[in-house]
Structure formats: C-alpha cells, structure tokens
Amino acid sequence: MADPRFFRVAGPFTLAQLAELSGASVAEGCDLGASFVDVAPLEQAGQDNVSFLDNRKYVGAFQASKAGLCVIAPEMADKAPEGMALLLSPDPYRAYARIAQAFYPNPAPEPWVAPTAWVDASAAVGEGCRIEPGAVIGAGARIGARCRIGANVVIGQGVVLGDDCTIGANATVSHALVGSRVNIYPGARIGQDGFGFAMGPQGHLKVPQLGRVLIGNNVEIGANTTIDRGAGPDTVIGDGSMIDNLVQIGHNVQLGRGCVIVAQVGISGSTRMGDFVAAGGQAGITGHLKIGAGAKIAAQAGVMRDIAPGETVGGAPAVPMADWLRQSAILGKMARKKS
C-alpha cells in the first residue's frame, strides 16, 4: 500500500471499470460490480486490492495472495487461489500499469510562482504552471501550460518546454527544445557543452559546441543524467524514450523513438540509435556508430562496432549474445581445469 503522505489514491473502481480501462478480459464467474480501492503487491494485497502476476518466479506468491483481483496471463488462470477475481491479458504488466495509473493519476500542478523564483520579463510561462522557490527562467524562454518547475531549476535563455512537463529540483536545461509530457528528474543536466577538442601536443583547443538538444514528446530523463548539446548537428532524443539515472549522452548522439537506456550507460558522440533500442546498465558505446532498430545491448557491454537491427550483443568488446555466452562458458571450463 502506498504511503498516503506521498501518494494520493483515486477510486474506488469496479471490476467492470478496471476491465475497460486496462483492456483486459474478465474471467468467467467474476462479479463485475465488485469494488476495489487500491493496488498492492501480491504479498501485501487484501480483498479490496488489485495485484498482478507477470513473472512465473512469483507463482507461489500469487497462489498464497489474499488479493481480491489479480491481472494475469490467461494460461495462469488455473493456478489462481479460490475466490480471487481475475483479469486476463496477454500482457499483464501493461494492463496493470493502466490500472495503477487510474488509482494514482498525475494531477495538474497547483498554479504558483514562488516569491523567490526569478522569471525574466521576456520569458513566456503558460497557464497553470508551478514555479518553485529559487527557480530561474531565462530571457526568451517559453514554458508550456501546466508545467512543474522544481526548486532551484535553471531554464536557460531561449529554451522551449512543451505542455505538461516536469523539471525536477536542481536540474538545468539550456540550448534545448523540449516536447510535451517530458519528465526530467532532479539534478539532470541538459544542453551543456559537448566534449569537443582539437587535441595535440601543443595543447587541446576547444571546439565551440553550436548545436542544441532536441527532446521529443513523452520522454523521461533520470536523475543526474547528462545530455550534451550538439557540436553543430543537434543531439536528439526521440519520442517515448526512457533514460535512467546517471546516463551520459554525448554530443550529436541521436536516439530514435522508444529507446530504453538503463543507469550508467555512456554513449559517445555522434552515435545513432534506431527506434526501440535497449541498452543495459553500465554499457559503454563508442562514438560514430550505427545501432539498428530493435537492437539489445547487455549490461556492461563494450560496443565498438555497428549493430544490425534486431541484434542482441554482450561482452567487451561486444559480440552476438550467443557467441558471448559460448566464450564465457569456455573460459569457465578452462579456469576450472587449470585449478
């Protein structure tokens, strides 16, 4: 159960309502008028709670659960405890996400501009925005409607935010055009100089970074993540991409739609990713590469070559996943024999 000090629950909802909003089907014999007041994990749920099962590792917890309603895959229905109502979906986690969003909607901010915030006279702030203490909105910046600007945020000169954006405390955004429904978490740094130098024994000469950061709609950027602006071409983050905490994205990088970049990944300059690429935690991707659409990069992989669309790679240097697993098995056998 969510702590009410931090989360405000909506509802209750009937089984019929939850089925409609989740897109799941109701198992036979369930009471469509049954009411539920919250979501909860399998182990903590009670009769008026909704839970879900998406991973077979937790079948035991599912069978022991007291949840009144559970979202599951159809093939798991025969394992349900007696008396539990069921919503059946081929993608239980996604259906549950819709239900959880209904119980915990993201409300519009309470409009307010803190007395200690500073908004330049030439900046434009949309209706219904909340600008918290210490925030700075630079000259010519444009903030869309219903945006939340956290404490001590700095929005630089000329920056554009779309509607319904949230910028977490202490984040900075400069040289950037940001779409709508973008969530930038606390401490993130968007649009600072790319790491560009003409290197030589006589010293390293800084190359002016003259591009921008272009962020699409429905993007999340995690806490303390840094995204450098382009050197001339822009750095681009495609619609619907999800970027975890502590990620470094270099200048001129282009991410397609729906990319998922997990914590501590580093992407060097001018690498291009297609749509729906996934990179596991601490993967390192060198510069000037092409990563095809749908490619998957394992955690801690070191990518030093182009990756074909749909290919899965692992290891350092990264190779096709089957090769990496085979190499790891052979090395393990050799080590055991030697010992």
UniProtKB/Swiss-Prot annotation:
Q: Which GO terms describe its cellular component?
A: membrane
Q: Where is the active site?
A: H251
Domain of life of the organism encoding this protein: Bacteria
Q: Which reaction does it catalyse?
A: a UDP-3-O-[(3R)-3-hydroxyacyl]-alpha-D-glucosamine + a (3R)-hydroxyacyl-[ACP] = a UDP-2-N,3-O-bis[(3R)-3-hydroxyacyl]-alpha-D-glucosamine + holo-[ACP] + H(+)
Instruction: Spell out the molecular function terms from Gene Ontology.
Output: N-acyltransferase activity
EC number annotated for this UniProt entry: 2.3.1.191
GO biological process entries: lipid A biosynthetic process
Q: Extract the CDD domains matched here.
A: LbH_LpxD
Q: Which UniProt keywords apply?
A: Acyltransferase, Lipid A biosynthesis, Lipid biosynthesis, Lipid metabolism, Repeat, Transferase
- Report whether Transferase shows up as a keyword of the record: yes
- Give me the segments passing through the membrane: none
Q: In which pathway does it act?
A: Bacterial outer membrane biogenesis; LPS lipid A biosynthesis
Q: How does it assemble?
A: Homotrimer.
Question: Which family is annotated?
Answer: Belongs to the transferase hexapeptide repeat family. LpxD subfamily.
Q: Provide the function of this protein.
A: Catalyzes the N-acylation of UDP-3-O-acylglucosamine using 3-hydroxyacyl-ACP as the acyl donor. Is involved in the biosynthesis of lipid A, a phosphorylated glycolipid that anchors the lipopolysaccharide to the outer membrane of the cell.
Which PANTHER family did the record assign? UDP-3-O-ACYLGLUCOSAMINE N-ACYLTRANSFERASE, UDP-3-O-ACYLGLUCOSAMINE N-ACYLTRANSFERASE 1, MITOCHONDRIAL-RELATED
Instruction: Quote the protein name from its UniProt record.
Output: UDP-3-O-acylglucosamine N-acyltransferase
Organism of this sequence: Paramagnetospirillum magneticum (strain ATCC 700264 / AMB-1) (Magnetospirillum magneticum)
